[in-house]
């Protein structure tokens, strides 16, 4: 009997789906990890990166939002503060030649007025913390200081080979560092799922309004183009790209009210602070990680990232068929459309009935 039980537990662990979720966390940024937990994915840790704001601020947002819902049993690991090469000055010099991006993320000019009003920090000192931005409450805890996000990723794929999804909905800096640190890292992961990687949207950027142009800009890849190329050409068993599809489904006021009808700390924060101007970007990628079958239209293509600083497409992706692909790139799964109803229902259930640390005891 003991042998049977032990064997059953070992089999259960071998079938377990783990994830490390890397993002530029913010007040309402908790939905992706709630979606993952609701889908029985065990989150080994959250990682912070520099994309919409500096990673130090994002890491504390991760800690704070976990505390809000009794999820502090999930550790947070600080990622790289700086992209591999890019800096605010270098970014703005590129813009002088190729045009201004509608959303500049952490590289937007420093604005003390906006910070005083609750905006997350941009440019300036990357390690400064703007407490006014923590509408979810300033955290009591802090990120883990035992190791870095990239080191943690490497350690976990060795501990659970073939079982750990690397989810990235911000810059790919930490993933690229892990790829370069350990030649086995990517191949030992289960897969890589990212939010970002838009294709064929230049005309919409040019003819739409500024908000529509914002929806089509690719700051997650463009803030660290070199890291994006390293990560998206690495030998992960599978890479799923939630690019254009992430713009498919938008929240509505009615949906926020429906979520709030089941009161808990997360449904309340979602109701108060989720911006209706933006689609379910990160949530779409998280749902695809949990249940790839929500994709109803996808294709396999070879993908590269433009790392030429002199190019107007610096940081954007380019896709190829196999016969025309250059050497050194790989095939990815590019999702065009998801089942919107299933996505909405998954988000709603995760918010209305969120998991907590008590569920893992």
Model-assigned labels for residue ranges:
Residues 90-99, 206-209, 256:
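Short, surface-exposed amphipathic charged segments that create phosphate/polyanion-binding patches used
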Residues 83-85, 174-175, 248-249:
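Short, active-site-adjacent cap segments at secondary-structure transitions
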Residues 1-10:
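Fungal secretory targeting signals
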Residues 92-116:
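A charged helix-plus-loop insertion that forms the helical arch/lid used to bind
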């Amino acid at each position: 009997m003991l042998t049977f039980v032990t064997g059953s537990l070992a089999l259960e662990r071998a079938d377990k789906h783990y994830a490390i979720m890397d993002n530029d966390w913010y007040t309402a940024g908790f939905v992706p990890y709630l979606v993952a937990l609701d889908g029985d994915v065990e989150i080994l840790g959250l990682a912070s990166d520099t994309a919409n704001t500096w990673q130090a601020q994002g890491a504390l947002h991760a800690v704070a939002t976990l505390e809000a819902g009794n999820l502090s049993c999930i550790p947070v690991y600080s990622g790289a503060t700086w992209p591999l090469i890019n800096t605010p000055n270098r970014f703005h010099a590129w813009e002088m030649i190729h045009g201004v991006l509608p959303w500049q993320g952490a590289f937007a000019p420093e604005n003390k007025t906006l910070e005083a009003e609750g905006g997350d920090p941009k440019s300036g000192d990357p390690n400064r913390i703007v407490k006014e931005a923590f509408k979810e409450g300033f955290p009591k805890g802090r990120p883990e200081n035992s190791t870095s996000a990239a080191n943690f990723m490497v350690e976990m794929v060795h501990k659970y080979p073939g079982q750990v999804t690397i989810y990235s909905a911000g810059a790919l800096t930490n993933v690229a560092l892990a790829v370069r640190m350990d030649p086995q890292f990517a191949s030992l992961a289960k897969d890589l799922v990212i939010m970002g990687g838009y294709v064929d949207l230049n005309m919409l950027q040019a003819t739409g309004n500024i908000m529509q142009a914002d929806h089509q800009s690719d700051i997650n890849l463009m803030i660290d183009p070199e890291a994006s190329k390293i990560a998206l050409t690495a030998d992960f068993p599978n890479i799923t790209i939630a690019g254009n599809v992430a713009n498919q489904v938008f929240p509505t006021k009615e949906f926020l009210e429906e979520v709030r009808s089941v009161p808990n700390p997360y449904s309340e924060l979602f109701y108060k602070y989720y911006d209706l101007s933006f689609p379910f970007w990160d949530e779409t990628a998280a749902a695809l990680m949990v249940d790839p079958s929500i994709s109803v239209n996808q294709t396999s293509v070879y993908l590269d990232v433009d790392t030429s600083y002199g190019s107007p497409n610096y940081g954007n992706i380019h896709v190829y068929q196999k016969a025309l692909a250059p050497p050194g790139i790989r095939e990815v799964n590019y999702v065009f459309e998801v089942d919107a109803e299933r996505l909405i229902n998954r988000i709603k259930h995760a918010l209305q009935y969120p998991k907590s640390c008590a569920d893992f005891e």
